[in-house]
Amino acid sequence: MRVGVMCNAPGELWGWARPVVHELKKHGHEVLLWLLECPYASGRERDVALRFGCRVAGPYNPVYAFNSLSKEKVDCVIQLGGDVFWGKLLAKKSPLYCYTYGFKSGLGKCHTVFTAYEKMKLEIKNAFVIGDLVKDALKLDLGQEKHPEELGVWSNYSGNRVMFLPGSRENIRSKSFYLIQEIVKILIQEWGNFKPVVLFPPFADDSELTLWNESNLNPLRLGAGIVMPQADYIVTQPGTNTLEMMHSGSAGLVLAPTSFLKEIPVSGIGGLITRIPLLGLKLKEYVLRRKLSRLKGYVSWPNRLGNTSILDELVGDVSPGDAARKITEALSDKGKLALIKSKLLDLSTQGEHSESVSASEKLCNFIDKSNP
């Protein structure tokens, strides 16, 4: 069977499409991985997707994408992000399946909708809960050649293991660099012998690592599934990373500084409006602050799923000193860290009846039965 898989953002590509493509190939299917344009794209999605061992198309401009998709023929489509319009265009009269964490327009046009957790299902009509694909992606990391012993500066280090995640897009990593650098300076002054690690995403070019190495921030290129369980505490930003932390049982701090807002794109008509000189930035801040307010006080996935504070969060005018104090406070209470780990792992397995069958396997099994 020829299966079209469609996605756009970095997190969806690495955390969702990667395990789905892997499982489809195990089932003997031919896979067409179609990348859509995305305001959150890193610019290196195609390079990363080519590692998956399947045919890759896109990302293309809307006109070229429309013409190309109109000519493609597949037996079914799995939509893992992006507008359902594009998935329907590729599927034509074939079944269109969608996996999503929340409601999006056009879901009514899909043959079947899947989601990860019961809480996510509340806003998606008639969705099937199959578990989190991000969890499957972490398991794929464990199949890499490198092992936990190969952790760079952490290989023979018994101090506080704090790991920083700088973001999937280069402009966000540039902002993160100075913030992380200042946080590390404060922690070195306080702790003396401190060796941080910065886990670089697969979408970063190797040339970026030079600056981070020269600043003794110890950038590392390893799968999150390998490194996260080795960290005592992780500092990150809102996004898929917080689900990786949940599945790894990794305590940490999620930062959403106001100073980063201008680097976050706004899609659709709102995005066009925010490009207006001078006024645009204020409008963007207003739009993004409204989005944050709709999250009911939590910006990380574990806290939203549990509807309680599990991971630490700092939102707004965040200073390096604020973050450093939060890190020091967290690491001083080992009992609390153990409790956080337990809560995260409980959330990770919430609603699972059988860990032996992964989310990607359930998805592929469903498609096989529906398309004999």
Feature locations, PLM:
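Nucleotide-activated sugar donor-binding and catalytic core shared by glycosyltransferases
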Residues: M1-P372
